[in-house]
Curated annotation (Swiss-Prot):
One BP term from GO: base-excision repair
Binding site for DNA: 106, 129
Origin superkingdom: Bacteria
Gene3D superfamilies: 1.10.8.50, MutM-like, N-terminal (3.20.190.10)
Active site: 2 (schiff-base intermediate with dna), 3 (proton donor), 56 (proton donor), 295 (proton donor)
InterPro entries: DNA_glyclase/AP_lyase_DNA-bd (IPR015886), Formamido-pyr_DNA_Glyclase (IPR020629), FPG_cat (IPR012319), MutM-like_N-ter (IPR035937), Ribosomal_uS13-like_H2TH (IPR010979), Znf_DNA_glyclase/AP_lyase (IPR000214), Znf_FPG/IleRS (IPR010663)
Name this polypeptide is given: Formamidopyrimidine-DNA glycosylase
Keyword set, alphabetical order: DNA damage, DNA repair, DNA-binding, Glycosidase, Hydrolase, Lyase, Metal-binding, Multifunctional enzyme, Zinc, Zinc-finger
Lineage, broadest ranks: Bacteria, Pseudomonadati, Pseudomonadota, Gammaproteobacteria, Moraxellales
Gene that encodes the chain: mutM
Entry-linked HAMAP family: Fapy_DNA_glycosyl
Organism (species): Psychrobacter arcticus (strain DSM 17307 / VKM B-2377 / 273-4)
Cited function: Involved in base excision repair of DNA damaged by oxidation or by mutagenic agents. Acts as a DNA glycosylase that recognizes and removes damaged bases. Has a preference for oxidized purines, such as 7,8-dihydro-8-oxoguanine (8-oxoG). Has AP (apurinic/apyrimidinic) lyase activity and introduces nicks in the DNA strand. Cleaves the DNA backbone by beta-delta elimination to generate a single-strand break at the site of the removed base with both 3'- and 5'-phosphates.
Length: 309
């Protein structure tokens, strides 16, 4: 699944399309995780103004052309800016072609652009497993974005934030008489917590696995048993790992590419993810694998011991 570094890299790779006008929108398979809106062709004659990322979502901001053909948010025709919310799902990617390109089997949408110099470009949404989504932000933004936690590379994601979240903010538990409610520390596995989008966004399996390894924390350690000092180290490694992954273009484990067709290289630096049965890079112990919430979690039994309080 494309995770935060892959989505961030995709955002950056869309820069050549900024300022270009949409000339055509073709939807070949609308049935993704949620159906593609049937009025996406309304974007024809709009200009792609900017691209943002929130968690693993891309937000494509389009502005309409004024009557004089100049992009503007002030429209005599009462046209308003539009925003697309794009999620790449398990296997999706946005791929840019600088010429008319034949539709491939898993191309579900092709958006055509023209630049000020008459250069024509196509943007293909490619998704073999069809778990992604392309939606209007104004219709689905509240539902999909409002519950999200802080960005891991922002100042809001700190050791203090994560530690207090774990210690004080477990789901409320009702007593048998349903009258009183008490809160307890989070006892779920620390890996599960840092992968929850409500806690912090975008820390997927690859980057959670690598961060926990570098922090010396067993992935199954109950979150409330992780010390504050360990949380400080973990948060620092999450930030460092994600920054490094973005710099290397993310991870290409199957067929992920960004819009310009480039693949990521972070997978070449992996210490433990996907390496069960191999030697630990640090101590040469055999790396082991457990399942947490249905996901593989590779770790070193010597470098990442379970410590019971």
């Amino acid at each position: 699944m494309p995770e935060l570094p892959e989505v961030e890299t995709t955002k950056t790779s869309l820069a050549p399309l900024l300022g270009q006008k949409v000339t055509n929108v073709q939807v070949f398979q609308p049935k993704l995780r949620w159906s593609i809106p049937d009025n996406l062709a309304d974007l024809v004659d709009y200009t792609l103004d900017s691209v943002e990322r929130r968690a693993k979502y891309l937000i494509l901001n389009f502005i309409p052309l004024a009557d004089d053909g100049i992009s503007s948010t002030v429209q005599p025709r009462n046209l308003q800016p539009r925003q697309l919310l794009v999620h790449l799902g398990m296997s999706g990617s946005l791929q840019q072609h600088n010429h008319a390109s034949d539709k491939r089997k898993h191309d579900h949408l092709i958006m055509s652009f023209i630049g000020a110099d008459s250069t024509q470009t196509q943007l293909h949404y490619y998704d073999p497993r069809r778990f992604g989504s392309i939606l209007w932000l104004e219709e689905y933004g509240d539902k999909l974005l409002n519950h999200l936690g802080p960005e891991p590379l922002s100042d809001a994601f700190t050791a203090d934030y994560l530690y207090h979240l774990i210690q004080r903010s477990r789901q409320s538990i009702q007593t048998q008489n349903s009258k009183s409610i008490k809160k307890q520390p989070i006892k779920r596995a620390i890996k599960s917590v840092i992968m929850e989008q409500q806690a912090v966004v975008g820390v997927g399996n690859i980057y959670a696995t690598e961060s926990l390894y570098l922090s010396g924390i067993h992935p199954a350690t109950p979150a409330n048993e992780v010390s504050y000092a360990q949380i400080v180290i973990l948060v620092a490694h999450i930030k460092t790992i994600l920054q490094k992954a973005i710099k290397l273009g993310g991870s290409t484990l199957r067929d992920f590419t960004v819009a310009d067709g480039q693949t990521g290289y972070f997978q070449q630096t992996l210490n433990v993810y996907g390496r069960q049965g191999n030697a630990c890079p640090h101590c040469e112990s055999t790396l082991e694998n457990i399942k947490l919430n249905g996901r593989a979690s590779v770790y070193c039994p010597l470098c990442q011991p379970i410590i019971s309080m």
